[in-house]
């Protein structure tokens, strides 16, 4: 890829990774409109690293507190709200890990088409709207409990289907289960850390085993652009939902789904 493609695709990935609007739906548009080829494994690793650094840095205080409390619960038997939340996040990660390994090949073969992405973009946009309208919006992430955490984890596993949006599915589930908007978003973002880390490790392993020549300058650019875009996106998203709710993102998803359908049937 040339520098322009790296910047545009890393910007798209960084901006859409944490918004409930589906990164896969957006990454398909350049290929449809401009005829760009698949970005490749090295680029995927780079943007995942950039997104991971962004969410860890943004929630650095929470991450440190969760990690230290989790370790204290293991080695010292000390229980706290943070240790419970850390265990719930780990529990919520398991469905995506298990189903991801089990269904990876099937998803790659049958569910990566633009038609599937268009349908899921619209369908899960409507679910997000319904959840935002009907939610009690009373609970914080510290009141989630293991049952709700596991259900949110299964929602995260649904995001293995392209077009669903990991953050969209998890925030929708959290709202349905009674979390307030900010808590739903924070829980979703914290849940993303082990998932993105695991994906980056697996893709890095595949990359080095493939023996492909790595353009480290393009990789560094992809990391930097996706980091800045993702960090900015997290900050603005939390401000927007506290004032306007999920409606702007629902409208955007419906418009994007319509645009994808137009390209499919043109």
Swiss-Prot record:
Bridged cysteine pairs (disulfide): none
InterPro entries cross-referenced by the UniProt entry: UppP
Key words of the record: Antibiotic resistance, Cell inner membrane, Cell membrane, Cell shape, Cell wall biogenesis/degradation, Hydrolase, Membrane, Peptidoglycan synthesis, Transmembrane, Transmembrane helix
Further information: Bacitracin is thought to be involved in the inhibition of peptidoglycan synthesis by sequestering undecaprenyl diphosphate, thereby reducing the pool of lipid carrier available.
HAMAP family to which the protein is assigned, alphabetical: Undec_diphosphatase
Family the entry assigns: Belongs to the UppP family.
Identification of the protein by name: Undecaprenyl-diphosphatase
Organism field: Shewanella woodyi (strain ATCC 51908 / MS32)
């Amino acid at each position: 890829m040339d520098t322009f493609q790296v910047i545009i695709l890393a910007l798209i990935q960084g901006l859409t990774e944490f918004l409930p609007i589906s990164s896969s739906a957006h990454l398909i548009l350049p290929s449809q409109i401009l005829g760009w080829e698949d970005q490749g494994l090295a680029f995927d690793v780079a943007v995942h690293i950039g997104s991971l650094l962004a969410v860890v840095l943004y929630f650095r205080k929470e991450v440190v507190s969760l990690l230290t409390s989790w370790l204290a619960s293991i080695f010292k038997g000390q229980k706290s709200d943070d240790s419970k939340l850390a265990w719930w996040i780990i529990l919520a990660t398991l469905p995506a890990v298990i189903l991801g390994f089990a269904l990876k090949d099937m998803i790659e073969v049958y569910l990566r088409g633009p038609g599937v992405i268009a349908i899921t973009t619209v369908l899960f946009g409507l679910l997000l709207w319904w959840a935002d309208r009907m939610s009690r919006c009373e609970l914080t992430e510290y009141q989630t409990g293991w049952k709700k955490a596991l259900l949110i984890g299964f929602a995260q596993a649904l995001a293995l289907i392209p077009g669903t949006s990991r953050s969209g599915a998890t925030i929708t589930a959290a709202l349905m289960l009674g979390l307030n908007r900010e808590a739903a978003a924070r829980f979703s973002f914290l849940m993303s850390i082990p998932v993105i880390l695991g994906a980056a490790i697996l893709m890095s392993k595949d990359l080095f085993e493939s023996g492909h020549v790595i353009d480290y300058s393009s990789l560094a650019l992809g990391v930097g652009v996706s980091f800045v875009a993702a960090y900015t996106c997290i900050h603005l998203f939390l401000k927007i939902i506290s004032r306007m709710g999920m409606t702007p993102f629902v409208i955007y998803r419906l418009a994007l789904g319509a645009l994808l359908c137009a390209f499919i049937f043109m």
